[in-house]
Amino acid sequence: MKELGRLITAMVTPFKTDGTVDYAQAQKLALGLLDSGSDGLVVVGTTGESPTVTWEEEHALFAAVKSAVGNRGKVIAGTGANSTQEALENTLKAEKIGVDACLLVVPYYNKPTQEGLYLHFKTIAEATKLPCILYNVPSRTITHMNPETVIRLSQIPNIVGIKEASGKLDDIAQIINNVRPDFTVWSGNDSDTLPMLAMGSYGVISVASHLVGNQIKDMITSFVSGNTEHAAAIHRHLTPLIRSLFVVSNPIPIKYALNYLGFEVGGLRLPMTEADEKTAALIRESLRGYTIDLPIK
């Protein structure tokens, strides 16, 4: 579903000093991301600490960000769960709030079969009018959704695309070759954006775009317009920064970077912890080599 955009940022969830969600700062961040290259935003995905944000907080964040963004960009609600019924109910609530699409992660911990994955996503998609984006991230979910399952799911009309974060480029090529023509594939790893574009993907659902959104957008636009040398140069330039943002579990590094740069997003909820000094020093050193696109003040 190409109207959702080529560059989508998976937003962090800002917290106040008392640990409650800072909805006003989430709105400010959303607008800043749109001002620095993002076409759309994922609200309460992995980067948004979905495991430790309550359903009520999630729904309030969906509403707050959609209210702030209006028609300036697309809002994609992270509504996935490892319970089909919970994911379905959360998706229906997001639809009622008025978001533009939903992101549905592969169920984690309970390790469903490929048939279970198919039925999970089919059940949710058939219950909602929202465009549904699949999310394959086996490094977090353990279960890998096979290309054959994705291809099968792509025949369901409102399953419109996939965030592919497996890093398995052979599988991704098989998906791109066999899904229906309007099914959209986004990279789910910043480091794979350009390689996947070369294979026929559409864009990226990014973490690094919190900081360098305009530069990532330039890379994508350059590649699509045929200026592959410029796109490759940007990719090489951004690689050290991207590496530093994943030196420990996301979103620990990106939250540290934003706070360090002066855009306050608060801490993390346990069991996630803040960056230790070794990690913080590495991120600070990495940031020195880059122009930051996000409006900080």
From Swiss-Prot:
Put simply, this protein is called 4-hydroxy-tetrahydrodipicolinate synthase
NCBIfam families referenced in this protein's UniProt entry, alphabetically = dapA
Catalytic residue list: 135 (proton donor/acceptor), 163 (schiff-base intermediate with substrate)
Keywords for this entry? Amino-acid biosynthesis, Cytoplasm, Diaminopimelate biosynthesis, Lyase, Lysine biosynthesis, Schiff base
Q: Which gene encodes it?
A: dapA
Query: Which organism was this protein described from?
Result: Dehalococcoides mccartyi (strain CBDB1)
Molecular function (GO) terms for this protein are: 4-hydroxy-tetrahydrodipicolinate synthase activity
Q: Which CDD domains match?
A: DHDPS
Q: How does it assemble?
A: Homotetramer; dimer of dimers.
Which top EC class applies here? lyase
